[in-house]
Every structure is written in structure tokens, then in C-alpha cells.
From Swiss-Prot:
It is found in: Cell inner membrane. The chain crosses the membrane at residues 258-277, 409-433. InterPro entries: Aas, AMP-bd_C_sf, AMP-binding_CS, AMP-dep_synth/lig_dom, ANL_N_sf, Plipid/glycerol_acylTrfase. Its EC number is 2.3.1.40, 6.2.1.20. GO terms for molecular function: acyl-[acyl-carrier-protein]-phospholipid O-acyltransferase activity; ATP binding; long-chain fatty acid [acyl-carrier-protein] ligase activity; medium-chain fatty acid-CoA ligase activity. PANTHER family: ACYL-COA SYNTHETASE, ACYL-COA SYNTHETASE FAMILY MEMBER 3. The gene is aas. Plays a role in lysophospholipid acylation. Transfers fatty acids to the 1-position via an enzyme-bound acyl-ACP intermediate in the presence of ATP and magnesium. Its physiological function is to regenerate phosphatidylethanolamine from 2-acyl-glycero-3-phosphoethanolamine (2-acyl-GPE) formed by transacylation reactions or degradation by phospholipase A1. This is Bifunctional protein Aas. The active site is at H36. Pfam families: Acyltransferase, AMP-binding. GO terms for cellular component: plasma membrane.
Length: 719
């Protein structure tokens, strides 16, 4: 009777909802593994699961006075993780057919993300041969019974949702020692817990995710700031979003691709969310791509109107772009205020009270954003991402990294770059963190000073940018940083070592591609290995396609919720080319994306990038990575720039051409370094050409198309 009373009470107060297939809990050997977000998690599971399980409760908790009162509701056994017999007792309970609940994290989350997963829980699952049933508890972290005070807006009676996930099994890992088997079992359970979080991620649009963040973290929470040094709260950002969304309707049609050429600023965030709320699809224009690159982008995405700022064009010396790109209409944000009518103001006021009604009807799977590739191997391609793919990548990042509302991001990478958009804007906004948007990553003295002044805890950038920040920064500038993430290019050992020596900070390297929104893998404090780019994110499937001549590794192909909707190409303007990849049998499979990158997985699942498939030369029958050649040159001449191209060779098939800004670099110095570091002599180029400056794309990457055109031309033309 008491049990029924409390169940009805909780159902009324918290509107508890249970979803999933409860039949998964009816087997003979069941181990239930929920996440742990509040002090009432155990009560919720005891009241609403269709079975009466035994709870494994850590002895430090089970000895508390209040546990005696709960004994009538919850059947529990004390668990001391330091005593092997406690683990064996749990194994026996499972083998006897009692459903057992273990909280693998061992403690209530203090970040809102998954905490450390204890190996013991995984070992119990593997040793007992149990069916593992993950359960996700959502909403209890918003109660006053959680440990997230100050990180979320706590409420007395938030809605609580219990998700019962599909059952799985955790086989006993193969390892010579029991300690290693236990550790591997813990890692396998950690993966199961991460996949469970991804399985219940919200299915919503970008605009709905902004509203959800406002609800979760509070409308008065600061969320974005720029060089005006006036932080915007979620409420203020929403107001700007509604204003922009309303006015954009006058210059565009629903479903239209609209160009956005804007700097890193708070208003840019409002324009993005405002556009998507009203069914417009922002195409993020790379203003560093020049007239030629922008013309390709405009053609591929069939853009008719570009929204920009007079002040931005003035400060960036970009007025030549609207003067030359006359095939589109240019709308300036400064002029929009004059278009606001009384009806617009009333509409904005009404939708501040009912913000969900401001969104036009759309589905998460529909197009939300267009980004453009760098064009390093040809014309820039339009990469169409849906609400689903962008938000899935944000959720993947949140699943493995413990970002909280106490964090402050420094975002200097441009928003037209997928790294800058997803990691630099969407992730902090939707995590409750505050982000400082700075318009240029090239200000190597100013960025460190701002990191110090704004108390930033998260910094990310390319290896080049991070190396320069470290050189110009005071040793105390980065005292608050706890995450330093490198992506978009290979992290140089010199940069890694400089950060370690000067600041005592570990740079975490990641890997991504625009087509994957963009993060594919990343090292995090709980799972990091130098020389790799981390493990593939949860929710993604990965496979390697064999490449002739490469024995260790293969071409990486990916499938997952963060994969793009497809390409827009100059050759077929406006026609969406859905992702598809050829498998090992030669069949084309829809939904798979071929990255074109050659990688290998180590025994623990960490990814090592070996180079682009297109950037391998076949010399005397052997495959040589052009990236390895460039790393060789950097080892000899770390302060200069180097890029490698291929030319035909009558005797060996292909030969290497090294372009360098180091006029003193010789084959002899490269040979000496190669022999010392075990690099094959085939990777040492004979043709070394000096350039005062490498041709670069707007992204800062070498322009390999131009370099390839120079290979067969006389060297003097470009020296």
C-alpha cells in the first residue's frame, strides 16, 4: 500500500513517463545499468520499473540513516568496490535470477554528463553472462535532489522520463590477466552507456534546441558575448532571434537558401537561429574564398540573397565582394531596423510569450544549414546539414566531454568553418556555457589576452593557431583553461610540447570533416592517447576499405546521425547528391560517407590518421603519403611552410615535388632526418622548390590545385 501511494505521488508530482520495451527486464539474468543524476534515482526505478530489482548501493551510502527508511521500498545490498567478495556476491545474485541494478558511475553526476564508469559493473555483467539493460533517467537532474545547483535551473517538479533501452550482452574480454579483463569490461560498459545516451537524444530543430537550452539553464543565464563586451542572455538572444527571423521573411521565401556573410558576433548567432526558425536555410559564406570561390558557392546552392553587415565589410576591407558579385542581392543588417513596423513589434512581443509558435512547421531531418568545403581539390562543394545531423554532433560531443554551464568558450574560428560553427557556437550555447566570439583567429597576441581577461576554460583551434597563441601568451594567460582542443590539421609535436612546457596543459587532438558536422573523433581526458585523434564518437559506425599498396589501415567510411544530407555541386546547381559509398564487395550503400582519409585503428580503438587517399604517391610500386613527406620537412624546418605534390616519372611511375618557404632546405638534410627517424628513403623528395609564399586557400590550407598546376611549369615562374 505504501509502495502504491508513493508511486501515485511521484506520478502526479513529476509526471513520470516510462518508455521502451519493458519485456527486456523479464529475462533470467538481468543487469540494469542506469545513469545517476539525483538522489531519487533509486526510488524512481523501484517505483516505476515493472520488476522488483536488488540495488547495489555503495557502502558509504547504504550506512546512512535515511537508507533504513527506504528499506521498505527498495531491496538493496551494500557494495564496497575495494572488496572483491562484494563483486562476487552481485555476480551470484544475477546468476540466481534476481534483477540487479548497478549505477556504473558510482556517484551522482556533478557535471550533467557521464562520469567515470567503474570497472566492477562491467565485470559483473561479463562474469555473470547477464543481459545488460541500460536505462536513461532524464529530468531528475533538474530537481533539487541533484548535484547540479548552479549548473542548471533547478525546479521543484520537472517532468521525469525513464527510457528502457534495448538489451545487450557484454562478453568476457580476452586478456591474459584478470585486471586487464576487468578494465576492458569497464570500457565496454562505458561504450554501452554512451550509446544509450545517444539513443534517447532529443529529436528537435535548431530553434527548438535553443528554447530547450533556455528552459534548462534559465532565460537570465549569459550565453554569448563578442568584442562589444556586452553579454547576451538566452532571453536577449531569443529576442534578437525573433526580430531577425521576422524581418528575413520580407526578403526571402520559406525553404530558400540564403547567404550569410557575417563575422563572429552575437548578432550572427541570432541571424542563424532566426533564419532556421522561419524555414530559411543559411548558407555560410566563406568571405576569404575570394570572388571565384564565392561564385562557385552561389552557383551550387542557388543563392539569390546574401545578408551581411556594412560595418563588417568596412572593417574587413571586403567591399569588393558585393561590387563584383552582382548576381545576388545584398541586404545589410544595419538597414533592417528601418523595416520594423508596429505589427512586427507586436508579433515579436507575442512570440516572446509563446516562442514555440514562432517556428514554421519543419522536421529535424530537413535541411538546416549549408557549409562549403575548402575547395583544396577543386570547386567548393555545398555540404547540406539537417537539424538532426548538427544536433547529433553536439550531443556526441556532450556525451564524451564534461562541458558545463560553468565553462566559458573562446571561439575565434569563423562560423563559416564547420569546426567554428558546431564546436565554437552550437556546443556552448546548447550546453549552457558562455561563448566569447572573436572575429579573427590570426590575432595571436589578442586572443590569449582575451582568454585571460574573460576567464575562458575552453580553447580550440588549428595546430598553427594554437602554436602561435602559445608563443605570444604570458605563462599565466591560460591558467583557467581545462580543455585545449586541436583540429582541422595535424597537431605538431612542437606545439604539443610547447603547451606542456609553458603552461602545463595537454592539447587534445581531434579529427573531423565538414560532411560529419564535423567532429568524428576526439581525445578527451577520460580517453586520450598521444599521436592519435581519439576514438570514433558514440552513435557512429566506422569501417575501413582496403587500399592497394597500404597494408596497415584503410580508407575510412562512416555512417551515423551526424552525416550530411548531401552535396550541392557547381556542375548540378541545386541538386542534392545524397551520401553513398562503395563497400568492399563493390556495392554502393546509401547513407555511408567515404572520407577519403587513410587511417588505422589501434588495439584500443584509437584512430591514427595516415593521410588522404588522394594524397598518396605510388613510387616504384610503394605507396608514400604526401603528408608524411610534409611532416618530414617540418621536422627539419619547423618554422617554415611545406606542401607536397606529385609529378609523373618515367622510371618509377610517380615522383615527389616538395614546395617549401625554406630556401636552405636540402635533400641531404631531409635524408639525414629520415634515417634518424626511420622514415623510408622513398619519402625523401629529389625535387625541392623554394617559394616565398605558398598559395593558400581562405581556410589557411595550401592550395593544392594551384600547386599541382605548377608542377610541370618552370620553377622560376613562382620562386
Amino acid at each position: 500500500m505504501l509502495f502504491g501511494f508513493f508511486r501515485n505521488l511521484f506520478r502526479v508530482l513529476y509526471r513520470v513517463r516510462v518508455t521502451g520495451d519493458a519485456r527486456a527486464l523479464q529475462g533470467e539474468r538481468i543487469l540494469i545499468t542506469p545513469n545517476h543524476v539525483s538522489f531519487i534515482d533509486g526510488i524512481l526505478l523501484a517505483l516505476f520499473l515493472p520488476v522488483r530489482p536488488v540495488f547495489a548501493v555503495y557502502s558509504s551510502i547504504s550506512q546512512q540513516w535515511y537508507m533504513r527508511w527506504l528499506k521498505s521500498l527498495i531491496d538493496f545490498v551494500p557494495l564496497d568496490p575495494t572488496k572483491p567478495m562484494a563483486i562476487k556476491h552481485l555476480v551470484r545474485l544475477v546468476e540466481q535470477g534476481r534483477p540487479v541494478v548497478i549505477f556504473p558511475e558510482g556517484r551522482i553526476s556533478v557535471s550533467g554528463s557521464l562520469m567515470k564508469i567503474y570497472d566492477g559493473a562491467g565485470f559483473v555483467a561479463a562474469k555473470s553472462g547477464a543481459t545488460v539493460v541500460p536505462v536513461r533517467i532524464e529530468g531528475a537532474e533538474l530537481t533539487h535532489f541533484s548535484r547540479l545547483k548552479g549548473l542548471v535551473k533547478q525546479r521543484f517538479f520537472p517532468r521525469i522520463h525513464l527510457h528502457i533501452l534495448p538489451p545487450t550482452h557484454l562478453p568476457m574480454p580476452e586478456a591474459p590477466r584478470a585486471r586487464e579483463r576487468r578494465k576492458l569490461a569497464g570500457e565496454m560498459l562505458h561504450q554501452i552507456m554512451m550509446e544509450a545516451r545517444m539513443a534517447v537524444r532529443p529529436r528537435e530543430t535548431l530553434y527548438e534546441s535553443l528554447l530547450a537550452a533556455q528552459y534548462r539553464y534559465g532565460a537570465g543565464k549569459n550565453c554569448v558575448e563578442d568584442i562589444n563586451f556586452t553579454p547576451d542572455t538566452y532571453r536577449k538572444l531569443l529576442t534578437k532571434t525573433l526580430f531577425v527571423g521576422r524581418i528575413l521573411e520580407k526578403y526571402s521565401a520559406q525553404g530558400e537558401n540564403i547567404g550569410l556573410m557575417l563575422p563572429n558576433a552575437a548578432i550572427s548567432a541570432a541571424v542563424i537561429f532566426g533564419a532556421v526558425s522561419r524555414g530559411r536555410i543559411p548558407a555560410m559564406m566563406n568571405y576569404t574564398a575570394g570572388v571565384k570561390g564565392l561564385t562557385s558557392a552561389i552557383t551550387a546552392a542557388e543563392i539569390k540573397t546574401v545578408f551581411t553587415s556594412r560595418q563588417f565589410l568596412e572593417k574587413g576591407k571586403l567591399w569588393h565582394l558585393p561590387e563584383q558579385l552582382t548576381q545576388v542581392r545584398w541586404i545589410y543588417l544595419e538597414d533592417l531596423k528601418a523595416d520594423v513596423t508596429l505589427a512586427d513589434k507586436l508579433w515579436i512581443f507575442a512570440h516572446l510569450l509563446m516562442p514555440r509558435l514562432a517556428q514554421v512547421k519543419q522536421r529535424p531531418e530537413e535541411a538546416a544549414m549549408i557549409l562549403f568545403t575548402s575547395g583544396s581539390e577543386g570547386h567548393p562543394k555545398g555540404v547540406v546539414h539537417s537539424h538532426k545531423s548538427l544536433l547529433a554532433n553536439v550531443e556526441q560531443i556532450k556525451t564524451i566531454a564534461d562541458f558545463t554551464a560553468n565553462d566559458r568558450f573562446m571561439s575565434a574560428l569563423p562560423l563559416f568553418h564547420s569546426f567554428g560553427l558546431t564546436v565554437g557556437l552550437l556546443t556552448p550555447l546548447l550546453t549552457g556555457a558562455e561563448v566569447f566570439l572573436y572575429p579573427s583567429p590570426l590575432h595571436y597576441r589578442i586572443v590569449p589576452e582575451l582568454v585571460y581577461d574573460r576567464n575562458c576554460t575552453v580553447l580550440f583551434g588549428t595546430s598553427t593557431f594554437l602554436g602561435n597563441y602559445a608563443r605570444f601568451a604570458n605563462p599565466y594567460d591560460f591558467y583557467r583553461l581545462r580543455y585545449v582542443v586541436a583540429g582541422a590539421e595535424k597537431l605538431q609535436d612542437s606545439t604539443r610540447q610547447l603547451w606542456q612546457d609553458k603552461f602545463g596543459l595537454r592539447v587534445l587532438e581531434g579529427y573531423g570533416v565538414t560532411e560529419c558536422a564535423p567532429v568524428v573523433s576526439i581525445n578527451v581526458p577520460m580517453a586520450a592517447k598521444p599521436g592519435t585523434v581519439g576514438r570514433i564518437l558514440p552513435g557512429m559506425d566506422a569501417r575501413l576499405l582496403a587500399v592497394p599498396g597500404i597494408d596497415d589501415g584503410g580508407r575510412l567510411q562512416l555512417k551515423g546521425p551526424n552525416i550530411m544530407n548531401g552535396y550541392l555541386r557547381v556542375e548540378k546547381p541545386g541538386v542534392l547528391e545524397a551520401p553513398a559509398a562503395e563497400n568492399a564487395l563493390g556495392d554502393v550503400e546509401q547513407g555511408w560517407y567515404d572520407t577519403g582519409d587513410i587511417v588505422r585503428f589501434d588495439e584500443n580503438g584509437f584512430v591514427q590518421i595516415q593521410g588522404r587517399a588522394k594524397r598518396f604517391a605510388k613510387i616504384a610500386g610503394e605507396m608514400v603519403s604526401l603528408e608524411m613527406v610534409e611532416q618530414l620537412a617540418l621536422g627539419v624546418s619547423p618554422d617554415k611552410m611545406h606542401a607536397t605534390a606529385i609529378k609523373s616519372d618515367a622510371s618509377k611511375g610517380e615522383a615527389l615535388v616538395l614546395f617549401t618557404t625554406d630556401g636552405e632546405l636540402t635533400r641531404e638534410s631531409l635524408l639525414q632526418y629520415a634515417r634518424t627517424h626511420g622514415i623510408p628513403e622513398l619519402a625523401v623528395p629529389r625535387d625541392i622548390r623554394y617559394l616565398k609564399q605558398l598559395p593558400l586557400l581562405g581556410s589557411g590550407k595550401p592550395d593544392f590545385v594551384t600547386l599541382k598546376s605548377w608542377v610541370d611549369e618552370p620553377e622560376k615562374q613562382h620562386a
